Amino acid sequence: MKLGFYLLGGDFMRLAIIDYDRCQPKKCSMECMKYCPGVRMGEKTIEIDENTGKPVISEVLCSGCGICVKRCPFKAISIIGLPEELSEDKIVHSYGQNRFKLFGLVIPRDGVVGIIGQNGIGKSTVLRILAGELIPNLGKHDKEPNYDDVIKYFRGTELQEYFEKLKNKGVKAIHKVQYVDILPKVVKGKVGDLLKKVDEKGKFDEVVEKLELKNILDRELSQLSGGELQRVAIAAAYLRNGDIYFFDEPSSWLDIRQRFNAARLIRELNKVVVVEHDLIVLDYLSDYIHIMYGVPSAYGIVSMPKSVRVGINEYLYGELREENIRFRKEPIIFEKRAVIDFKNRPILLSYSSMKKTLGDFKLEVSGGTIYKGEVIGILGPNGIGKTTFVKLLAGVIKPDEGEVIKEGDIKVSYKPQYITPDYDGTVEDLLSSITNIHTSYYKSEIINPLQLEKLLDREVRELSGGELQRVAIAACLSRDADIYLLDEPSAFLDVEQRLRVSKVIRRIADEKEAGMFVVDHDILFQDYISDRFIVFSGEPGKFGVGSSPMNKRDGANKFLKEMQITFRRDPETGRPRANKEGSQRDIMQKEKGEYYYVDE
């Protein structure tokens, strides 16, 4: 079994990667050059770029000693060894010397091809190349990239014909981009007018109904929420006639019902490539899977195409069996948790039936209790009152009727749904203001699993959405509290980050005997962490009704019945899988009233 990376020395290609956002030559003594053995012997292993004033490392002259990695005060340098089969002539695209490199490409085909991988591994780059927005440079920076070289490179493969069509404008590609929040900056107008303008199929009314867009047709794009923008972007892509469609993270901002509505619509298209971090949605959507692995921001490798079940399972195991490559040291396995009778444990918090009116929205919640060490997952559509309920528990707002009863001096820690980077200082400053972060326990339980080591010296205001989310989760869980309230902790996180966060939440609940309320739309995430469910139903934006905490099976069954989605559990990994609508298993489970998973 070959280890895909984490190697130094030997007969293989070496990558020297510099994070130029972290590199600050004006604030250091150029330790990378000062201590480099090659430079000290008079070689040009590291030189200063005249334009940027920042170092450039020669991957040919670099010996791979790793001294610059250890000496750099800003942790900006990585030296990574690759297996010899990943030689320089296997590079499909490079963003420059000492920058990200992509090996391999996804093969478009009829049906839906899904791509799974960490953030920063090159998934969006693959989509841009296949959509004709970026001509791959094959790792050559000394001349402008052109399709003739690309066609020659892929000669004899399925991609040769595809790039020939791209060159001759013979492929009409429709691309739904990842960051839909930028759309109001480049497109102006009302939703209905914009969708009618791009409708080339005469399916405007059908799409409006399927994606539940009727109530926002008269609104300006600039007035829409993230979830509304996402649905409009998906609708606009679907309504256009194309030879191939690309969807980059279509489930972001959407609730569970909206995710499956979008997935059903996307599956109607003939040829699709989709990037998605919600494993259940990806499984439901796709006919084939490509795994992308490597080192984020350094290099990414595209696997051969695989069947959906095999592809997702191999990703979770961290092992490509046909290629005989292991790319992750530890597999991700969803152990079945024993059902615990929490009623034998002390009560942390209880609440009576509560009512709250906010403007035109009315919320009613049945009473309930949370016990020590219990995690309660909160399920329901957007705009149904889940966040309002969490705010009632946190004491951020008061109920109009009813009360929250804390048993003794109970402390509550709350991570809100929408996080604003309004802290002046570094991540280390923020976390240190809450607790002592320089202990071995904190490093092993929070810093390492949430991958915060390289963020500690970063300014909070400069963090991306996913980075800010991980810091906010760490801040919430670092507080000395008895109950933790987390609103959509999986938002902006990739597959592996979501699974790490779920394990951190579960471990803290078990070890500290803390109570947890978790709102999230990722069913796999909720299935892993939760002991019981609270289910919200109603009419979004008008009224919401929250149940009392229910056992996991009954709660999930109630929720999925409302969604008209059935689940089974994969026998190999234990992960929940959504049945394809209308399949034999889907029909059988609906007839039995068993919407939650059954074993295969």
Curated annotation (Swiss-Prot):
Gene3D superfamilies membership: P-loop containing nucleotide triphosphate hydrolases
SMART domains named in the record: AAA
Gene Ontology terms: cellular component: ATP-binding cassette (ABC) transporter complex
GO MF assignments: ATP binding; ATP hydrolysis activity; ATPase-coupled transmembrane transporter activity; oxidoreductase activity
Annotated ranges, domain ABC transporter: 77-318, 348-563
Record: residues binding ATP 2: 380-387
Record's compositionally biased regions (Basic and acidic residues): 569-594
Region feature Disordered, mapped onto this chain: 569-600
Location of the 4Fe-4S ferredoxin-type domain: 14-44, 53-82
Keyword Repeat (UniProt): yes
Keywords: ATP-binding, Nucleotide-binding, Repeat, Transport
NCBIfam families per UniProt: PRK13409.1 (NF009945)
Protein name listed in UniProt: Uncharacterized ABC transporter ATP-binding protein MJ0719
Organism: Methanocaldococcus jannaschii (strain ATCC 43067 / DSM 2661 / JAL-1 / JCM 10045 / NBRC 100440)
